[in-house]
From Swiss-Prot:
Gene3D superfamilies: 3.40.50.1860. GO terms for biological process: sporulation resulting in formation of a cellular spore. GO terms for molecular function: alanine racemase activity; arginine racemase activity; diaminopimelate epimerase activity; lysine racemase activity; methionine racemase activity; ornithine racemase activity; serine racemase activity. Optimum temperature is 37 degrees Celsius. Belongs to the aspartate/glutamate racemases family. The active site is at C82, C191. It comes from Bacillus subtilis (strain 168). It catalyses: an L-alpha-amino acid = a D-alpha-amino acid; (2S,6S)-2,6-diaminopimelate = meso-2,6-diaminopimelate; L-lysine = D-lysine; L-arginine = D-arginine. The lineage of its organism: Bacteria, Bacillati, Bacillota, Bacilli, Bacillales. This is Broad specificity amino-acid racemase RacX. Coiled coil: none annotated. Homodimer. The keyword Isomerase applies. Optimum pH is 8.5 with L-lysine as substrate.
Length: 227
């Protein structure tokens, strides 16, 4: 059974589940209801605020508590569709006896080799942790970052969490995208909240969606357990 530790943020859960369902159709031809995997989905509230620093101890505790509760339901492995939570990946995995997929590793696999200039869009804690930048630089890719881009991403994430946000968030995204596209040949969406906007836009340069990469790996791992 697939375990999904979701709710970070709440609006990222349903797009992730949709992507898992899509990959069931793409990877093994699921069509009838009975063809889809058993999934245990636990939406775990966490003390994340887009406008203030994270209390890492409280954040880590909330996620580990959620992961342990999810494991007790009998899941075979866990997918956690939240990039910021992967700052604590080692501690979370140590608290579990089942494996947890790593969203960064799965996302990096999908980056095309010709890409040389990457922009990583994520929360302040994700960017500050450099969990993407370290791997990208190790692969010979330049990571471009500007402080005012980060401020715009922070505003975008905060706006997504509000009701009836689409018109406002698409305008915020368009302004940010127009500048980023002049500097980068690939964008990495390292925040699953951004799917609320990015799933509905077109881009002339590739956007690597960490949520989709994790969903693909979730289904591939499920199939490996079935074989």
């Amino acid at each position: 059974m697939i375990g999904i530790l979701a709710g970070m943020g709440p609006k990222s859960t349903s797009p992730f589940i949709d992507k898992v369902i899509d990959y069931c159709q793409k990877l093994y031809g699921a069509s009838n209801d009975i063809d889809y995997p058993h999934m245990m989905i636990y939406s775990c509230p966490t003390p994340f605020y887009a406008d203030r620093p994270i209390d890492h101890d409280e954040m880590k505790k909330a996620i580990i508590d959620g992961a342990v509760k999810l494991e007790k339901t009998g899941v075979d492995f866990i997918a956690l569709p939240c990039n910021t939570a992967h700052v604590y990946y080692e501690e979370i995995q140590q608290a579990l006896s089942v494996p947890m997929l790593h969203i960064v590793e799965e996302t990096i696999k999908e980056i095309p080799h010709p890409a040389k200039k990457a922009v990583v869009l994520g929360t302040e804690p994700t960017i500050q942790s450099a969990i993407y930048q370290k791997v990208l630089k190790g692969n010979g890719q330049e990571v471009i970052h500007k402080d005012h881009w980060q401020q715009a991403v922070n505003q975008l994430i905060a706006a997504i969490k509000q009701p009836n946000h689409m018109q406002h968030t698409q305008a915020l995204w368009q302004t940010l995208y127009e500048e980023i596209s002049q500097h980068a040949d690939i964008i990495i969406s390292a925040c699953t909240d951004l799917n609320a906007v990015l799933d509905h836009i077109q881009s002339e340069i590739p956007i690597i969606d960490s949520s989709a990469c994790l969903a693909k790996s979730t289904v591939s791992t499920y199939l490996a357990y079935q074989s």
